[in-house]
Amino acid sequence: MTVAATTELEAVNIMMAAIGESPVNTLTGTLPADVVMAQSTLAEVNKEVQSEGWSFNTEIDVTQQRTNGTNHIDLSTDVLRIDPNIHQHPTIDAIQRGLKLYDRLNNTYVFSEDLICTIVYLRTFVEIPEPARRYITIKAARIFVDRLVGDEGLRTYTQQDEIRARAILMETDYVNADHNLLRGDPSLTSIFDTYNPSSALIR
């Protein structure tokens, strides 16, 4: 039997239940202050978790093209982390500044070529897999209770619940990312030579 993935509305209602409040039927229109806060906390945690870079929101060898006339490289608003492939662009040290790439090595926003990059994107809640939704919901619910009530004894979810949910997410991400010793880790081409959540798992 297929189990439906957690929706954003369900996630918010889980958070509302954690403070003993009734569920809501919609997240549009004029909402109570605590619902708005729950929604904001969920979005905050969603961005925080996705910023780590997982298989579901990381794309490798993406060509970032220069803008005609300026030769600047403009970024979309859903880019969380980006880095050029150091093997293909050894003379460039580009970082994100606002919605542009900036070359720290040459002190300029102007690039002489398009760049091949590894990019972590911010996906919407409905685009991410269920283990990620579950972990984000539990983490957000715990933070929401702490902020609104401030009483650890009223927590519906404990830190252990959060740890277990993260472990499931990491295991799922490890499988989906095709990590293995023979083929290597496809995500370790540039920016993520230092860290990728599921690469921390000991097999």
Go through the PLM ranges and name each one.
Residues 2-6, 11, 96-203:
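Internal mixed-charge
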Residues 27-29, 89-92, 113:
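N-terminal start-of-chain detector that recognizes signal peptides
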Residues 1-40, 195-203:
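Short, extreme N-terminal leader segments that mark the start of a protein/domain
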Residues 27, 57, 152-153:
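Short linear functional motifs in flexible/disordered or boundary regions
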Residues 35-107, 131-148, 157, 166-169:
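Divalent metal-cofactor coordination and adjacent catalytic microenvironments
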Residues 17, 22, 52-54, 58, ...:
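Flexible, active-site-adjacent loop/turn segments at secondary-structure boundaries
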